[in-house]
């Protein structure tokens, strides 16, 4: 039976005609949604102008709190927010690095700074008290939850050292939540006092490791996936208080954590990644199907959108590809470690 004969047979039956019409309407609907998603993606990435950070108090004497501020992406957030006219509270582990960075920012951008030495791996209440004391009375409108840790190399979950496991959970999850509980009330109070003439902003750094379940990075992957759900839930809670909450998803960025030194089209420098993030606040970019989430860097956005529209983030195929990739990375890392150990003996 040809396709024409099949369709003719269906249309001769009223029920079959309705089924065919229903299938056609579903197809048209899905195609329309896809076209709208692609259009929104391209407009977000390449058409809309940069977000005006005056919405969040830039050049109005307001403060931004940045965690993990002494290196990499966190340091770049500090530079770029200061360049936009925010005073900055720099939060990181090493006091000396923080003081050097604060002096550089004050000299270059003529803004005020404060530093808070904070070891996020310890979960010590003194840390949160020190942070709370530092921001008490300040008109804080922005929090950048940047502090984070991954595995030293890809590792099977059953072979993960207890300290590494505990540090990842404490830094990525516990510290992020407690820091937000410390800072968010100050942001909400500032917005309220300003009668919502400015808005508050909480950006939390996510990862493709949280977007896609990632074998051999199971603990890190789980911690970032947790942040994804938590951040979206928090966005719903704080919206009525004039505070925008957004999870920022990235693939690889040149940094100490990724161990990648050279930038490329798909792997931006911290400077380019942070610029894309700040320019695109409030837009989903590659995260077209996710609430209060953005994948801002254009190459990462296209990758995210492509995965969502094809294999899906939770598919067996995506999991298998991730497994094989990280097995290979682990094998190379172990081989390199063995070579360096042998050279050291010689």
From Swiss-Prot:
Top enzyme class: oxidoreductase
- Which residues does the entry assign to the active site, renumbered to this chain? 220 (proton donor), 224 (lowers pka of active site tyr)
Give EC number(s), comma-separated: 1.1.1.330
- Listed GO CC annotations: endoplasmic reticulum membrane
What is this entry's stated membrane topology?
A: Single-pass membrane protein
Q: What does the entry give for GO biological process?
A: fatty acid elongation; sphingolipid biosynthetic process; very long-chain fatty acid biosynthetic process
Q: Where in the cell is it found?
A: Endoplasmic reticulum membrane
Pathway given for this chain reads: Lipid metabolism; fatty acid biosynthesis
Return the similarity comment: Belongs to the short-chain dehydrogenases/reductases (SDR) family.
Name of protein: Very-long-chain 3-oxoacyl-CoA reductase
Which organism is this entry from?
A: Scheffersomyces stipitis (strain ATCC 58785 / CBS 6054 / NBRC 10063 / NRRL Y-11545) (Yeast)
């Amino acid at each position: 039976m040809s396709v024409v004969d099949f369709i003719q047979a269906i249309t001769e039956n009223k029920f079959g005609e309705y089924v065919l019409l229903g299938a056609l309407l579903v197809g048209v609907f899905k195609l329309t949604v896809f076209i709208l998603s692609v259009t929104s993606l391209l407009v977000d990435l390449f058409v809309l102008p940069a977000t005006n950070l005056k919405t969040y108090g830039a050049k109005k004497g307001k403060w931004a709190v940045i965690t993990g501020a002494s290196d990499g992406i966190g340091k770049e957030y500090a530079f770029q927010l200061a360049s936009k006219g925010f005073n900055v509270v720099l939060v990181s582990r090493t006091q000396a690095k923080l003081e050097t960075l604060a002096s550089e920012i004050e000299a270059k951008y003529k803004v005020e700074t404060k530093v808070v030495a904070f070891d996020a791996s310890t979960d010590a209440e003194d840390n949160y008290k020190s942070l709370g004391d530092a921001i008490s009375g300040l008109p804080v409108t922005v929090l950048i939850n940047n502090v984070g840790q991954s595995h030293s190399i890809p590792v099977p979950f059953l072979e993960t050292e207890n300290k590494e496991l505990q540090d990842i959970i404490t830094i990525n999850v516990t510290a992020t939540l407690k820091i937000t509980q410390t800072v968010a009330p100050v942001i909400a109070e500032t917005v309220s006092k300003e009668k919502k003439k400015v808005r508050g902003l909480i950006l939390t750094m996510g990862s493709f490791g949280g977007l896609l379940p990632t074998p051999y990075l199971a603990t890190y992957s789980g911690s970032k996936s947790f942040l994804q759900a938590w951040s979206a839930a928090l966005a719903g809670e704080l919206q009525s208080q004039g505070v925008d909450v957004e999870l920022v998803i990235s693939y690889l960025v040149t940094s100490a954590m990724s161990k990648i030194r050279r930038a490329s089209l798909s792997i931006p420098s911290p400077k380019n990644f942070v610029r894309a993030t700040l320019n695109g606040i409030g837009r989903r970019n590659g995260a077209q199907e996710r609430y209060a989430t953005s994948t801002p860097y254009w190459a990462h956005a296209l990758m995210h959108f492509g995965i969502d529209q094809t294999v899906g983030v939770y598919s067996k195929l995506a999991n298998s590809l991730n497994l094989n990739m990280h097995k290979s990375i682990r094998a190379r890392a172990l081989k390199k470690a063995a070579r360096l150990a042998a050279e050291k003996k010689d």
